[in-house]
Amino acid sequence: MINIHEIFQPQENIIHFVIAHKMNFKILLRFLLSVSIEISAQSYSISGHIRDLKSGKLLDGTVVLLKNNLYTISNTLGYYSLKDFPKGSYSVRISRLGYKSLSTTVLIDKESVKQDFVLESSPIELDEVLVNSSRTSKYLRNSPYSELLIDKTQIESQSSLSLSDVLKEQPGLSLSRDGIWGTEINIRGLSRENLVTLIDGNRIATSTDVAARLSMIDLDDVERIEVIKGASSSIYGSGATGGIINVITKTPRFNENFILQGGFSSGLNSVNKLFSSSGSIAGGNSFWSSKISGSFRKAGNTQTPSGELKNSQFKDFSLSAAVNFIPLENNLLKFNYQLFKAEDVGIPGASVFPSDAEVRYPDEKREMISAGYEIQNISKVFYKVSAKYSYQVIDRNVENLPHITQNVAATDTTEAIRAAVLKITPSSIHKNNNLQFQTDIILGKNNNLILGLDYWERNYHGIREKFQKIETLASDGSVFNTTIKVVGEKPLPDSKYKSLGFFAQDDAALFDEILFFTLGVRVEKIFVSGESTLNPLYEIANGKINYTPKGQKVIWNKIKADEISDSWNLGLKYSCTENLDLTLSIGYSFRSPSLEERFQYIDQGSYVRLGDPTLKAEKGKSADLGFRYYTSDFKLISSIFYNRFKDLVAEIPGTFEGKHAFVKTNIGKAQLYGFDLHSEFNFLNNYTFHITASYVKGDDITAKGNLPGIPPLNGNAGIKFTLVDYLVADISSTIFAQQNNTATGEMKTPGYSYFNLSCASTYNKFGLIEFQAAGGIENIFNKDYRNHLSTSRGFIKSEPGRNIFLKLNLKW
C-alpha cells in the first residue's frame, strides 16, 4: 500500500517543490475559494432526461452542450443538469456515440427549466462527441488532429486482455507483444518512449523494456480512451513525439435525488481459460457522488496454432474508489484512488532474455492517489480554474531463470568448475508526482484560451540480484565444494527525471464555424540526475556479505543535467461543405531521453544493453493532412502524414567488455511517412460495411536503411448488422501484408489474414436489472501467424489461436 509518509519526504516529491516556491495547498485552496466569491449570481438552470427515440430507454453518457464551455454529461439514469448561468435563448447540442446529434434552441426565462430530449440511433459514428485529450473539450469532428475515441460500449462487447488489445484494430495503431499480459501499442511506427500514456490525465512513467504500463489498467473501469496520433499536441511536452493515449476512468455522477447503483461483469476466454469478473457500486445526490469498483482475472497458458505458449499465464486484480463533492456552487472537489496488482505473470517473449529462459513477474503493482479542485463559471472571461495533484507508485519485480550453466576445465593450478546461474531478480520502484494548474479563458465568441503549468517527476530506485551455484569438481567429476553466491548489481543508478512546463493553447471557430483554428505552445525545463553507481554493488558467498567484491568499479559517475526545450503545434479544420472537412496540423516536438536510455545496464545472459548519459534530445517536425466526409449513411476519415526526426535515439550493435551489446545512440536523421483511413457505409437497412487501412514507412536517413519496429501495410474489413432487435453481429477480417523493409537484426515477416465473429446485445431490462450479453470467435480458422512487432521484440513466433469468448454485463 502507499505509505503516506513517503509522499511528504523531503526532496522526494512535488509538495516540497511547491513549498520551495512559497506556496502550499492551503494557500491554493484559499485562492480558489476567493476566486469563487467573484462569481456573479446566476441562478438559472436547465435539467431533464435523455431517451432513445425508438425504445424510450434512458441514455447515460450523453453530452448536453449549452454554449462553448458549459456542458454536462447525463448520468446512468439519463439525467442531466446545468446550473448558474444568465437567462436568455440558448443553442443546445445533444450528442452521444451511436446516435445522431440534436441541435435546438431553448428559452431559459425562469429559474428552473425542465426539458427532456430524445435521440435517434445511427449506424454510422458521426464523431459528434466531446474529447479532452488536448486539455480542452471539443467535438471530435471539429478536432484538426488525427484523433480517435473508444468508449466503454466498445470495450464491454470485446474479449480484450489489455488496453493494447482494445486499440489494435484502430487505423494507425498496432499491437506489440512482450507477452500475452504485457503488451504495447505502436502508433504510426513509434511506440514505448515516444508515446505519452495518461490515466485520468496523469502520466504513467515507468520502464518500457518489458511492457507493463498498458497492462496495469482495469478495462472494466474505463469510461473511454482518447488517442492523438502523431506529435499534434505539444502541450504534453517531452515524449509526445509519437502520440498521446489518455485513459479516462469511470466517474461517479451527481443526481438531483439520492441514488444507489451497481454493476457486475464476468467473462470467459477459451484460448487461455481466462476467467474474469468485476463489480462496482456507486451512489450520490446533488452534493456528493462516489463509487468503488474491483476486478479479478486469472488465465492459464495461451494456446496457439503451433502449440501451447509456455509461461504465458497471469493473475491480476484491481480496486478503485472515487469521491466527488460540490462544496460551493460551481466548485468541484475530487478524490481518486487506484490499485492494480498482478501476480505470477509469465513473460515468454521479451528480447532482453535468453530464448530458453523462464521469466515472470512474481508481482507487479501500480497504486495512485489523486485530488483535484475546479471552479467553473467564474466570470464572462475566466470560465474555469483547476488544480490537480497525483502520487503514483509502480513496483516492478522480475524473476528470470536463465538455465545457463558454464563448465570451466581444470588447469595445472585450478580445479574444474561448474557454474550455474540459478536466477536473476531485477526489481524497481518508480515514484511519480504530478501537479497541474490550468485556467480556461473565454477571449470572445467561439474563442477559448487555456493557460497552464505542470510539474511531474519520476524517481527510480532499483536493484538486481544474480544467484549462482558454483561447484568445484574433482578429477572424477564428483563435487567436493559448493558455493552459493549472490551478486547485487544496479541496472540503473538511483535517478530522477523532473519536468516543469508552461503551456498555452488557443482554440477558435471563425467565419460562422467554417474554420476551426488551434495553436498550442509549451516551454519546458527538464532536470535529470543520477547517483554514482558501483557494480557489482556487493557479493554474498554462503551467507557472508562483501561490499568490496573483486572487480568492483564505478559504471556511472554522479551526474546532473538540465535542458530547456520548446514545442508547438498548429491545427486547422476547414468545412468545405456541410459534409466535407479538410484538416491540416503541423508541429515541432521534442523528447528528452529517458532514464533507461541514459543509464541502462542490463546483462541478462544473452547480451548487454547499455544507455548513454550524453544522449541528445530527439527533435521532430510533423505534418498531417486529413480528408473527412460525413453523411447519414457514409463516413470516410483519412490522413496522410510525414514526420522527420533529428537525433533519433535507437539501439545499435556493439560490444561491451568483450560481450555482444546494444548501445543507445543518437543515430542522426530519420523519417516516417504514410497514411491511414477508416470508412463506414450503411448500404442496406441495418447492414454497415466498415474498413480500415494503415501504412507507414520508416527510413534511417543517416545510415540509409530501414527503421526497426515498423508495422507492415495492414487493415481490416467487415460487415456489422442487426440479427434481431437489440442484437448486433459483426464479421470481419484482419489483413497484414508481408514486411520485407526490415532493419538490421530484424526478421522478415510473411503476410497473413484471419477472421473474427462477434455478437452483442444492447442492454435489456428485466425487473430492476439491465443486462447485456456478448460473445464471439476470434481467429475463427485457427490461423498460425507471426506479428512482426512481436517478432522484432522477442521470441513469440505464433499469436493466439482460435478463441471463443463470452461476456455478461449487469447493472441496476
Question: Language-model segments: which ranges?
Answer:
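Transmembrane beta-barrel wall of Gram-negative outer-membrane proteins
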Residues: S45, S270-K298, E308-D344, D363-N377, ...
